[in-house]
Each structure stands twice: as C-alpha cells, then as structure tokens.
Amino acid sequence: MGKYSLLLIAFFTCSVYGQVLTGRVLDEKRTPMGNVTVSLLSPKDSSLIVGTITDKDGKFSVKSERSDNLLKITMVGYTPKYINCNQCVELGDISIFPDSKLLSDVVVTGTNFTTKGDKMMIRVPEDVKKNTFDGYATLSAMTIPGLNVDLINHTVTSKTGEVLLCVNGREVEKGEIQALNPKDINRIDFYQKFDPNHPSASAVIDFVMKNRDSGGLVYGNARHHLNIGKGDGMLDVKHYKKNSELNFQISGNYGCYTLDRGEESATSMAFIDKKVIKTSEVKNSIFRSNHLRNRLSWLTQGRGSLFQISAFLNREHDVNDQNISQAYSTMGGEILTRDYTHKDNLSPATQLYYQRKIGKDGLFRTSIYGNYSHTDKFRDYTSTSSFWAKTEEDLFRVSPNMLVGLILGKNRPFFYATYDYKSTRNKYTENEVETKNRLTYGNGLFQIGNNFIFSSKFRVTLRFTENVLSIDNGNSSWTKFYFSPSLLCSADLGHGNTFRGELYTYVNDPQLAYYNGSSQQMDQYQILRGNPDLKNGHCMGGEAIFDSNHKWGMFELLTQYINMPKYIYEDVFVDNDKGMFVHTYRNGKSYNHFLFNTEIRFNVIPKKLIWMVGGEYNFFKERDKRLSALVGGTDLTYLGKNIIGKVELLSPFRYLAKGVEYKNPFSLKLTLKYTLKDLQIGFNATNPFMNNSSVETNYTADNYSNVAKTYNPRITSNMFMLTLSYRISYGKKHNFQNIEMGESQSSGLLDQQNIRNEKMESGKK
C-alpha cells in the first residue's frame, strides 16, 4: 500500500520551489525509525545540499529550493535508499530494510551502544538530550567506562592518554563543546585507539551533529561560586549565510576573594655549618584576577572542502597577596612574611585551516597556527630578608601541520606531519641585578602508517614516527632524531566483547620552561633554576583493554605499563658558598608505572538511574622510590523530568611524579541541573562542608626535606556553585562547527608558585 501511495504522490503533486519535503521512515516491520539520516543530494554529482535526521516517530522534513531532488535515506545496518523526488513534496511512508552484509561488520551490544571497527557508536537517548544542556553534560550522562568527564573544569580524560574532542570529525576547542546543543546530536563516536582522521591521537570523542533549522545560534553561560567571589562566563554567537559561518565568542573568569588557609609546610635544610628547620603557614591571602578571551572566525564550505580563518586575543591579570606566618629554628618568635605577586599577560593568535576530501572518502587537511605572548610579572617578598623581582617574557610560536589519509580497499594508509616552533626571550631582574635568557625550541613529528582491515572482526594499525627535537639556548644547541614505531590491534570477540591492544614507543619531551636556565629566588634560603642540558628519554609502553557491552550495562578491564628512561625529576642541592639550596631538574634513572583498572556500569533503572563502580591498582618505581596504591570510585547518575543529577565519589590516592610523592584526598562531587526549554539552572558542589581537605606532598633529598599540605577552601573543597545557561536560535538550517586553534597561550618561564604541582604520568603516543 505504501508503494502505491508513493506513486500517486509522484504523479499528482506539483513542484513548488521553496517547499518542504516531508515523509516518514519505517523499518521492515513498518515500525517508525528515529535517528535515520535523510540527505538531500544534487542529482548531477550527488553532492550534499542539506540533511537532517528523523524524529522518534520516524518523521522528517527537508527544505528544498529546486525542482529536481535526490533523497538518500541511510541508517547503520540498513541498505541505503535513494529516491528521485522530482515535483514531490509529501513522500509518505518510506521503508528501508536490513543489509545482511553490512550487519556482519556491526555488533549491536545494547540499546544505545554499537561497536563497528575501531569505534563505539553511542546513540544519545531522547531523555538524555532533553535533560542535558551541553556536550560535556551529555557525555557525562552516558557514563562511559574509561572516560572521566569533569563538568566543572570542562575536561575529558582517559587512562590511555589525552582525549581529542571533535565535532563532525573536526577538532574543536572546549568552548564549542560547551556551546553544543544536545538536541542536535545524531550520535557520539568513541575511538578508543585509532581514528583514521586523527591517527596520532590516543583517543577521540567525535560528536556527530545533525543540521540545525536556524540561521544563527546564541548561547550564554554564567557560573558563580556561592561562598566566594569567583566565577566565569561565556557568550557564543554564530551567524550563517549560504555556505559560510561567522562566529564570535567571548569568555572569561574573575576572582576577588580572600583565603584564610593555604599551604602549610615544614622544610629541613642542612648546611655545612648549621641546620635550619622552617615551618610556614599561609593565611589571609588576597586574590584578584580577571581573564578575558575573544575569538572571531569565518568558515566557508564547498563541495567536499572547508576553509576557516580565526583570530584570537587573550588578556590575563592576576594578583596574589599572601600573608605567611613563618618560624625558623635559628631564631626565636613568629616571623610575618608578605609575598606579593602581580602578573599580566597579553596573547594574540591566528590560525588558517583547510581540509578537502580526496579519492573515495580520503582526506587532506592542513593548518598553520601562530601565537605571540607577552608576560610581565612582579614579585615583592618581605621577610627576615627581602627582595623584589621583575620578569618580562616575549614568546613567539608557529605550528604548521598536515594530514593525508586514504582508503584503498581494506587498507587505510595515512601520513601526518607537524612542527612546533617556540622562541622565548625573557629578562629577570632581582634587586636591580638583571639576567637575560633566550631559548629556541623545535619539535617535529612525521608519521606514516596503515590501518589493515583483515576482516570485519580484526584490524591492525602500524605507525612509524620520526621525532625531531632541537634546543638552542644561545650558548649551545643540539638536534636529535628519534624513531618511534607502534602497533595497535582491535578484535571483535562476539557477544558484545571487544579487545584492543597497543605496543608503542614515544619521546618524553619536557615542557619548554624546564630548559630555562635563569635563577629565581624562592625565599631566604632557596633558589629555583631550570636546566638547559636536560635530555630526552625514548620511552616505551603497552596497554590492553577488554570491553564487554550488554543491555544490563558495560564492563571494562584495562592494564597499562610505561617505562621512561632518563626521567626528569626535581633535584635539590646545597650551595654552601652562597648559603642557599638550589631547586633544579635533572635526568635520572627510569620511571616505571603499572596500572590495572576495572569499571562496571549498571543500568539500574533503564533511562532513569545509572550506577558505575570501579577500582584501580597502581605501582610506581621512580629512581630508588617505590609506591603501591589502590584507589576506588563510584558515581550515580539520575535522569528525571527535566532534571539530571550526579554523585561522584573517589577514594584518596597516591602517586609519584618528578621525585615528589603526592597524596590526594577523598573527593565528593555533586551535580544537579534543571532544564526548562532553552534555559537551564544548575548547582555544583565539590567536597561540601569539608574544610580540612588538602593535597599532601613529600620530597626528600640529601640534606633537604619538605612536607606540605595545600588547602584550597571554597575552591576545591567546601565549594558551592550556581550555573545559568540560555540558548536561542533563529533562521535557516546550517551545520558548521569551529576548528580548534592551538594553545592560546604559551610560556617558557618556570613559576616557583607552581612547583610541586605535577600530574600523574600517562602513556603518550
């Protein structure tokens, strides 16, 4: 009956320019199908004109401004259907049927999760779209084992390394994910190991978006702490015209508050003629800050090509006025110390980006990013002895890159190249004594490889990488080459089970600041100095991941081992002639880290309540230090009527990094958000009513030791925050997203206030 209806419509419906093509998509059982892709193509070359997806009732509407239309209906696991709908407006019911050959490559493991090749395709349910308001909240609500989504700092991390965030296959910055409308998400692709469009990435999250029925989009977000003068906000405006997009985004944060507690430490320093024990407590520290970030970009898209130009300006202003109570074993009484710092930064940047399809679904992509950064920092330290210091830095950065990826039968060869050039000139003045320093840094990466598709259930990716590293500090220079191969495999074991493994090598390259050889005074007895002679370690590692996906939930086992020779660690030694202890960085013995992690996700109440629980064992060996640590965590996610709530618990955990032992406290995070159409009101809390939560560090060297506890009340503990988001849209249908710019700000300065603030090492590919 549906076929005859379609023929009658084709014969008797008149062509109307600017009309809307409508229809309904059904499966082989004549059940309406949601999330089916409907594309309007040009009959001449089959190029995409516009597209959409069906709603939960299988209905769709596509606006057409021409009389000859070619409609393509596609759904994973189904045979694509093409319809010549000349002079058609109402298409009626359209049935599509399963493709037995295609289904052999797809493993359906649950209602919302499908595994195909190297990726997991995640269908976002309508209840999640309805109750979340941005990309981060949507990803968090899906509760995917192996992914950690931080809704406060807007970050996504995994145990296997950094997670690259994309929209429709294009790398984007976090502001774009924050402004993303969950209602426009077609699906989310999770590449745990290999993405052909980003072959050097450890893991990729790609938001596949549908077209919007709007000529513009305005998104605003504001957050403010309830018990401290601190907050941030963002305004994102997009305007579309034909095949182009103009985007303006402004974001920033502010702070004006006083902390009554900070770092509390005890330091022991043994000189040749005396031993000094110093105790220190930071009290009543005043913080003032305002950061402003502006971005303007223009994007145009042609047949299979895309070009974008972006401009960026960042301004930062920070004031930290610390009042410290100190005591020394060599003198009696309490000493009141003031440590005042004032920092300003200006950083403009620009980027050109171009990509084009080549061959059959191949890709050519190139971009160049440039950045200039100027930093002024002033410090006034008043104690038993006083000093003032001023630092000025000018940093230039250029970073081009290129990717060529092809599809040749069952092979996906690729070539990727990038180079990061940085040049810093800085001047450090202390008590009118001036020291100048310059440093030029280059890091090139050239990678070639292939993704071998042996069958629908087994793939292997081989990558060969050549790293070129160069350093020039004005007095000496060197250039070194490192060859780093890697081997990945993915296997479908059936019944919802998959295995992914990797053996890899990489170069452990320290940050630019560690090479800075200038000296900075920390206090009466301590100096911080970089090391221009640091070496690079040729590291290796391996990891294996087993996933088991079912309708009741998901289960993941992960194990990882990394070995880093010539590991960079903090070294402290005494200079008895000057009566000072010098903090610097050196290469030491190897660093070894082994972890075993497991996480289980339960659909406690389908579409309502999700519970995930996990545990991890870590073993660290760094030079002569060894550390074993267990950590456990759990989170509970609730989705209700326009409400999403989440509770996250993490037990205390310890780790080693650069010679320092860290102990992070118990962590509790609460999230509650209510959505009403285009408005969302939210509440976040971190470690509520826990005023004594602190990060502990412990460092010991010859003749020196330091034990410290760092408190951050009302920011990382006893923190309460209110959020408000609003979104409006208008006009015609378009679908473009921003390309990610490089780091908006770089610096080659060692900051003594950030010492002992290292993260746990993870594998890098």
Roles of regions detected by a PLM:
Residues 397-399, 439, 445-447, 529-531, ...:
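Outer membrane beta-barrel strand-and-loop segments of large Gram-negative receptors
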Residues 200-222, 321-325, 367-373, 378, ...:
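Surface-exposed extracellular loop regions of Gram-negative outer-membrane beta-barrel proteins
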Residues 30, 57-59, 79-81, 88, ...:
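Membrane-proximal, glycine/serine-rich, low-complexity loop/turn segments characteristic
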Residues 22-34:
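Structural motif
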Residues 44-59:
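Short, acidic Ser/Thr/Gly-rich low-complexity loop/linker segments typical of extracellular
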Residues 342-347, 351, 378, 382-461, ...:
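Outer-membrane beta-barrel transmembrane domain signature of Gram-negative proteins
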Residues 235, 259-275, 319-335, 350, ...:
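Outer-membrane beta-barrel translocator domains and adjoining extracellular loop/strand segments
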Residues 41-47, 70-83:
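A short, solvent-exposed loop/turn motif at the edges and junctions
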